[in-house]
Amino acid sequence: GMDRYNAKMSAEAQLHKNWSTGFTGTYVNSKISKQSSANNGILATVYGAPSSYDLAGIPSHVEGDPYTQNTFRSTSGFDGAYWAVDNNEFLERSQRFFGNTYLKYSTKFNTDNHKLDVKYQLGVDSYTTNYTDSWGYGHANGYGEIDLYGYSITELNSLLTAAYTWNINEDWLFDALVGNELVENQRKFYESYGANYNFPGWNHIDNATTMVASESLR
């Protein structure tokens, strides 16, 4: 399933007859729960079972041991569909904020045919997505594993513009626009992998006997 929440805010203010300011921002928070695919897909044990095999009615584990799978097809590389739903977890969590703020100076030089607008705007787009791929104790007749990884990306935008308009007469109009823009982008990737839980019932990386972690930033 998917849960998503959005929040948006904006405001403007006239500080002076020549000065104005404002900001706008949007925040998004989402969580997606899904099942594995490809070589770890739970459908592998569904397609391999005949129509006469009651996948829902026959217990997915042996009696008295919820961590030993009971499936029609061998679980040397795959998990039973119903066992996987109860013991494996695949989550995608994302948080994102994007918005900008500005300060603007406007003047007509006490005339009717001249106008100057100088505006500075600072914007940001930042989001983080964290993934959890968790295979419970008993996965593929083993002791489980977990992979925690994610991305963080932040882009900062700085923009300064000056726009000048001169209505020379009814036939002639002069417009000029100058500006400067700076963009900075930062990306980070991290991953923590753990395998072979010490004991069942706690599918957490702190319960793994083997752990590997890495991080990169650019």
Role assignments for model-derived ranges:
Residues 10-98, 112-218:
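Surface-exposed loop/interface segments of Gram-negative outer-membrane beta-barrel transport/assembly proteins
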Residues 1-2:
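Surface-exposed beta-strand-turn/loop segments characteristic
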Residues 107-111:
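A generic beta-sheet turn/junction motif
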Residues 99-106:
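Alpha-helical support elements that line or immediately flank enzyme active sites
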